[in-house]
Amino acid sequence: MAVELRASQALKLMHDVNLTLVRDSEQDLSARQLTILLTVYLEPPPHTVRGLAAKLNVTKPAITRALDTLGGMRLLSRKRDEADKRNVIITRTVDGALYLEHLGDLVSEKARELPR
């Protein structure tokens, strides 16, 4: 089922969700960090630093810096690929799944509050 939003409603939804996250969450993620987290959870694995860098059109060091933060928050984990030591595999964590479940609930809640 497609959801129809006017541009002003979509922007208000983004504003309200982000405002709540900044005010209430201990984990203040950047747009890049959130995009990486959502990519790892919503798209089928495997996920690698190289693959994420290509998908997001950013450098591998930029992905690595974001993963340092996300790993420190225990939202994602990473390990060397045993088959190819050059690759680093990015994996999901329980804390990351819980964070995104909360985020999904928050988006749904704020969408219901939008003026019609």
What are these regions (language model features)?
Residues 46-88:
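Canonical helix-turn-helix DNA-binding module
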Residues 1-27:
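N-terminal leader segment of winged-helix/HTH proteins
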Residues 19-58:
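N-terminal helix-turn-helix DNA-binding core of bacterial DNA-binding proteins
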Residues 21, 101-116:
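Amphipathic alpha-helical dimerization/coiled-coil segments
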